[in-house]
């Protein structure tokens, strides 16, 4: 078998990586929640009757409301709160670090929260920066939300802009 990467210099100590368990760890679930594995859910809260698809990661401190649907390959980071009756489509990404230091901060005190209201639908591969989105909003596929959304409507583009009020 061939090894990839550089060989360790003779006498160099073997490094052991920090291993974190994957799966479902310290999650608070509401009633009738469905989770399709594999997933990586930890220290988060999932509301009643919510569906979590495969290959989803929901990080500590995130809160998902009731009757939500989180589709496969979505990433929901720390400090995200999602209201009730929301739909998060495949590959949607939530970001809490604005890179104010020029690169990844890695410091939670520099991260910012994201809050979605009720009945918000996020399209496939949309990126949501730390913003607040009001109730009854549709975000189109591939959109990048960089500013707060305070008017119910359909938004799309990069940066996302209002196409039509609801």
Set out the residue ranges of the language-model regions.
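Acidic, glycine-centered active-site loop in nucleotide-sugar glycosyltransferases
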Residues: 151, 156-159
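Active-site-adjacent segment of SDR/Rossmann-fold oxidoreductases
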Residues: 132, 147-148
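Detector for the N-terminal beta1/A-loop initiation region of ABC nucleotide-binding domains
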Residues: 28
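Short glycine-rich donor-binding/catalytic loop of glycosyltransferases
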Residues: 62, 142, 148-150, 166
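Flexible, glycine/small-residue-enriched loop-and-beta-strand segment within the central core
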Residues: 4-25, 35-133, 158-166
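C-terminal/domain-terminus segments
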Residues: 136-145, 154
């Amino acid at each position: 078998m061939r090894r990839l990467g550089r060989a360790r210099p003779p006498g160099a100590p073997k490094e052991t990586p920090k291993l974190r368990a994957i799966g479902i760890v310290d999650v608070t679930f509401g009633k009738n929640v469905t989770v399709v594995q594999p997933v990586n859910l930890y220290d988060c809260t999932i509301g009643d009757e919510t569906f979590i698809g495969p290959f989803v990661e929901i990080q500590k401190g995130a809160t998902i409301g009731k009757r939500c649907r989180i589709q496969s390959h979505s990433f929901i980071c720390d400090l995200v709160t999602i209201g009730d009756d929301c739909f998060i489509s495949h590959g949607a990404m939530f970001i809490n670090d604005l890179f104010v230091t020029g690169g990844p901060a890695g410091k939670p005190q520099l991260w910012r929260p994201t809050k979605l209201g009720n009945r918000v639908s996020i399209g496939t591969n949309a990126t949501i920066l730390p913003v607040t989105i009001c109730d009854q909003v549709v975000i189109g596929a591939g959109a990048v939300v960089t500013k707060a959304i305070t008017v119910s409507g359909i938004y799309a583009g990069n940066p996302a802009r209002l196409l039509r009020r609801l």
